[in-house]
Every structure is written in C-alpha cells, then in structure tokens.
Amino acid sequence: MKKKALAFAAAACAFGMLLSGCGSSNGSDTAAEGANIITAYNSEPQHPLIPGNTNETGGGKPVDLLFSRLISFDAKGNASNEVAESITANDDATQYDIKLKDGWKFTDGTDVTAESFTKAWSYVANAKNGMVGSSFFSTIKGYDALQDTDNLKGDEQLEGLKIVDDHEFTVDLNKSDSVFAIKVGYSAFAPLPESFYDDTDAFGEAPVGNGPYKFQSWDHDNEIVLVKNPDYKGNRTPKNDGVTFKVYTKDDAAYADIQSGALDVMESVPASATKTFETDETVQAYNKAGSVIQQFTIPSSLKHFEAGTEEGTLRRQAISMAINRENICDKVLNGTGTPAVDFTSPLTPGYSDSLKGVGNLKYNEKKAKELWEKANAISPWTSDDKLTFAYNADGGHETTYTAVVNSINNTLGSEVAATNPYPTFNDYRTAVSDRKVQGAFRSGWQPDYPSAENYLVANYASAAADGNGSNDGDYKNSEFDDLCSKAAAAQTTDEANKLYQQAQEVLLNDLPAVPLYYANAYGVAATGVSGFEMNWQNLPVYENMTKSGK
C-alpha cells in the first residue's frame, strides 16, 4: 500500500470513518441498486488514482482492483503469472526477460503491450514526475540518470528497459535483485495506456486499467465506484458485480453501518468494539495473525534526535524502552495486536524474535531513564522541548497514542511527550510528505509483496528518502543499504534472510522508526455477505465476496 502508509491503525481502530455512513454516489445502470455490489469502507485517497503515485491504502485498495500487473498474489501471498507469460532471470539476477500473454486489453479497448510496461515504469522512476513509487525502480539500470530534475523533461526512459516486440521486453539491473520477479506484483509496476500521457491529471480522476474491475465514478470524500470488468482474463475473476468504496471519517459509524447492513465490509473495528466484535451476532467477525506493522517515525533531522549522533541514538532508544507495548496491546488494543520485536511481521519470510538489539523494543523503565540522562549530559532537554506524536484523528489512533505518550511521560518522570493530532488522513499525510511535521509521526506498513525486502528497503533505504519513496523520516545509513544490496544478490532465500536480519539489527540500534505492534488481520462483514476472508495484506478479498440472494 499499500500501501503501504496505512490510512488507519491496523489494530485498535484500524481505519477511520465518518460520523454517519457516507452517502452513495450517483448511481448508474452498471452499478445499480439491487446488483451484487459490495460496499467497502475506505479513506479519501491522498493522491489521484495513479498506481505509481499511490502508497497509502485509501488509494491503494481501488488501484489494486483496477490494474493487473505481471504477477498476482492469492489470499496467502502465493504468486502466479498474471499478464506475464514468463519472467526469466539470468544466473546472477541482473537481467530479466519478460514475455507477456496475448490478448490483454485496457478498459478503453487498447492493447496491453511491452511498451505499456516500459513507458509506465520509466515515467514513475523519472524524478521530474514526482511519483512516490519512484524508488521501487532504483535497481533498474539508468535510474540514477533520471533523478536530476534540473535536466529532465519527464519523458526520458530507463536505460535498462529494452523492448523486443509487443509481447516481450528485457530488464537490465544495476545490481543483482533476486526479489525483482516478486516485486513486479506491486501496483507501482502496473502498465499504463497511452491515454495516461495525454492528460495525467484527468487520468488520475478517472483511471483506465486492465484489472478485474473498471472505474465508474469518484465522488470525492464520499465514494469510489468500481464495476466488474467483463473483459478481464486474469487470476482474480470477480464473483460480484462491483465494489463501491465508501469514505468514512469515524470508524464507529462504519461499524454501525455493518451492523445494519448499510455497509458490507471493513478491515478493522473501532476501539469501542474490540472486546465485543467476535461475539457480536449482528456481524461476521475475522481475527487472525496479520502482516501489518504499526510504528512511529522520528525524522532524522529532528532536534535532540538527529540520526547518527550519540544524543539522537540515546534518546531514540530511551523513548522506545519507555513504552509498555504489552500493556497497550492488552489494555488498549484488547488483544488485536502483538508487541513488535522487529521491523517486519511474524508472517514475513525470515522473521526472527531474537535479533541483536531487540531489547531496545522491550519496556525497561530503569534503562530508559539511564539513557535519557546520558543524552541530557550531551544536550539538556529543557522545559521548552517536547516530543510530539502526530497522527490522523479520523483513524481511531487517539487511544493508542495517548497510551504511548502517557507511558513515556510516566517512565521518564516528566512531560516529555504530547500528542499532535491532524484532523484527517489527508491533512496528516500531506504534512508528512511535505516534511512539515516537527516531531514523531505515526507510520505503518502493509506489505506490497511478501518479502522482508519490501518492509526494509521501501521504508529505510537511502534511495527511498527525500520524497522518492516511503522513507518519510529521510533515514540514510550506508551499512544498512549495503546489507540490503547483498541480500538482494544472495543465491538462496536463507542467505538473503540472514542478511536482511543483519540489516534489521542496524535499524534496531538506530531506530529511524520505533516499532510498536503487529496488527492482527481483523475486521467485520455484514451477515448477508458470503466469501468474507482477509488476505496476506490484512485486507478483504473483495473479488470473492457476494451478497445473499444476489
């Protein structure tokens, strides 16, 4: 997300909604009342619906259904070829030959060709175009040449992409990347039709894709309507006639709509219902281990917390040790989250709960005070200093971050921390993206593809800093980058995972972000819905859902 930057807390009130169920958009003959249309809750997307410029769930959910990539994932995260006929790597994973299946079309009737991919990838990679997914293409040869915005027009192409014919192209990488064949399942790697380049702004408001659904309408701050794509020929054929994403800013209202049948599915529950939703007979409940991690990021340049300095490291570790994660998971999240011990998730290949430095994620009042005082000896923390925690108030995060702040202040014995809520997810994400947040800020990660690489490189690699990806804290550490590069070049999965674990140990010392908890995959559906399950991204499998009697 998607995705990535999560619009809502994936555990104690994962997604925010409006006080009352949002109104539906103007209907049409295609998505008419009485059709087998699934209504799903959502936030207003931060950006227009362009795959390469979407890295949060409000936009990520509709984008995923609108655009098919080279491969797709089933509910458990297993990959299968989708648009690709084959993806073949050379011996050291520095070159890939990609062949496409014949007959794929966009919903405007134009063909999906090799150029549909190479041109789209180059556009997203090109820094002149300001796409948030740019860093995902950093291993492709020629990426660095597309980062000098002063000397670019925006239409320059990645040197490493070569078209063989309409159904085949090759990818030359600047270093080994054994994860590349899985990475291309992420939405940033979606193909784009020629109409995109004619008017990118208009396209983002009414996208043309090649996925299981096609776009019908977008009533901003209200709903996004998708209908079944009758020409889709991939692995995710819808069992329903469409999905309407309804925008909420209060999760209690969304839950009430699930109970009444006015809304079909939501991938969370409000804090007020975390103790009772599994026994609530007016809903279908789902609650299993999930892949989402919730954390907060401390900007690398923040006063007293500067990355790479002795004071900054001491204070980051002290803050982390001052947080009682067990208490938050038990008392605030009511068992819908598990204290984090790394930067991935228990469902991620290579997960370990015994990494060097894991003690920095454990509650330790004595050590937290000791480290804080050592930092004070370097540069005193004064009454004018305050570590604020920004979050979106429409996402149900207040109870979690109130608990975080209280734990820090109770542990360190002073008013060190305070909450800093933003009214909406859009307000909050804009402030984060524009580097306007003068303090820590809520962050979370929903995997784009099932690999430790996705959690680590997307969020902490130097190439993903400075607005080129999801490294919103602008953390840069060459040792971490080198370990991730070695992992990508590893010949076996076990070797790669060991290197990713070493990279995590660098993060556990530096704490560019502070992991809080792993969110369960949990949510509710209306009682009249069939086929309700959550996938490896902690999201409903929308295409499998139907309504009784429809």
Annotate each language-model stretch with its function.
Residues 317, 329, 414-428, 455-526, ...:
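Extracytoplasmic/peripheral linker and loop segments enriched in polar/acidic and small residues
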Residues 113-120, 166-172, 211-212, 240-242, ...:
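Alpha-helical secondary-structure segments
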Residues 338-375, 394-399:
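Structural transition elements
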Residues 523-550:
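Long beta-strand-rich cores associated with HINT superfamily self-processing modules
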Residues 167, 172-238, 242:
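Gly/Pro-rich hinge or "lid" segments in bacterial periplasmic/extracellular proteins
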Residues 196-204, 231-276:
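Ligand-site clamp/hinge motif
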Residues 41-91, 208:
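N-terminal lobe/hinge region of extracytoplasmic solute-binding protein
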Residues 116, 123, 129-193:
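Surface-exposed binding/hinge segments that line
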